[in-house]
């Protein structure tokens, strides 16, 4: 089935998942929506996160997508269960895949989780980890400065190193062997996070495991794309498209052109 896969995020972070989808499923076409105008979602009230996420979901459904990936940990924590109940197409989040990936690699069963305020306060990762491995010990930390850094294209340099080091300081005394990057923005800071946290801690991003789950669901539902299909990915951003295009082009390693999307109106539209 040559309909597109819909991928949504509060901003550019979901591109880390989209890149893995493109790598593992090269014949599948993606429609990406990043709500860069209203990013970050983490500090927002739950009802606001729910409203904004449903606006993106409704837009993607109107585009005729065959499957939706909520490539935002905060939105996954708030909306995934509800979306699965209400929609007739498969919907995948990024928390369960991230938890499974962490349990696969940990030896000590001591796992750290970093994420947005909402994701950490929801305890979604702790629940998901304990569902997979009941003996796991989890230490979580909210990292509010990280998403604004990524959205403003600041992913390296002395200032970023300083911010990351100061933010992660409470975790440095925790004896863990695995750290979940519990926000899809955070892999863009992975090099800096890795230097701060040390070489003995494995960093986990949910992109790879999420793509595996998407592949399995496409096969199970008989909706995989034709193998001779050449996809033309489509990108939408609610904020500054030039900034989005710059970050997306760097991360995806190919030129990206984005359409401006207006959400929150009676009829979502591209401008």
UniProtKB/Swiss-Prot annotation:
EC number(s) given by UniProt: 5.1.1.3
Keywords, in A-Z order: Cell shape, Cell wall biogenesis/degradation, Isomerase, Peptidoglycan synthesis
Gene Ontology biological process terms, A to Z: cell wall organization; peptidoglycan biosynthetic process; regulation of cell shape
Catalyzed chemical reaction(s): L-glutamate = D-glutamate
Entry keyword Isomerase: yes
Residues given in the record as substrate binding sites: 9-10, 41-42, 73-74, 184-185
Keyword Acyltransferase appears in the UniProt entry: no
Active site residues of this protein: 72, 183
GO molecular function: glutamate racemase activity
SUPFAM superfamilies, sorted: Aspartate/glutamate racemase (SSF53681)
Pfam families assigned: Asp_Glu_race
Pathway: Cell wall biogenesis; peptidoglycan biosynthesis
HAMAP family given in the database record: Glu_racemase
Protein's job: Provides the (R)-glutamate required for cell wall biosynthesis.
Annotated family: Belongs to the aspartate/glutamate racemases family.
PANTHER family given in the database record: GLUTAMATE RACEMASE
Protein name per UniProt: Glutamate racemase
Origin species: Exiguobacterium sibiricum (strain DSM 17290 / CCUG 55495 / CIP 109462 / JCM 13490 / 255-15)
